[in-house]
Amino acid sequence: EELDLLESRLKIRSKTNVSLINQLGTHIIQSGGKRMRPLILILSSKLGRDVDSQIVTDAAVVIEFIHAATLLHDDVVDMSEIRHSKDTANTIWGNKGAVLVGDFLYSRAFEIIVEINSTEIYKTLAHTTNTIAQGEVMQLMNIENTKLTEEDYMEIIYRKTSILFEASAKIGGIISACSSEQIDDMAKFGYHFGIAYQLRNDYLDYFGSKSMTGKNLTEDLSEGKVTLPIIHALEKCNSKEKLLIGK
């Protein structure tokens, strides 16, 4: 029931009188995502009390809009052509349209945050979106960096991926008036879930299938992204093999 309401609100809150935003926004939001982040928010909101279902749904919409915006921007940066087995928005409408509609979704998300009127939620999401941007820049800085350490890699995936899961779990606790200790525990769950989620994605990029991932295999390799499979391979291979991987 909550997910059905979420889908309805996503459609309503993404609509404008600008046709390109409607077309491109519908494409990214209805592209077959699993809604993992808003689902975590909804579930964590059930652990407390005094839950306002409208606020829960609106907060879940915010999380999904932020996620969709990052996907639009990521696909432009990575020059990706396929996501969830469909053409990416930048492939269909071009980079400019994808970036601008990503900006719209970010700003619409923060419009809704203002309506929710929770300083704690606002602070959490302001920090989260800023950290995501830092993570994306850190990843860009380390393209083809075969000296990237596992520690640095973990920091990158925390900033660009895990922190939104962390925020989702935390916000559910805030909405349902959980104790500070409970909210911290929820945030830790979101953190670890997000790390595991990204580790799995990075593994499947090499050892999965297109039917599982919805995108072409070894995209990370072709984009020069150094992920954990490459880091471990570099640790175990000889100098000749390292040179080959570096190329």
Predicted region positions:
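N-terminal amphipathic/basic leader segments beginning at the initiator methionine
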Residues: E1-K11
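A mobile "lid/hinge" subdomain adjacent to the ATP/sugar-phosphate binding pocket shared
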Residues: L243-K247
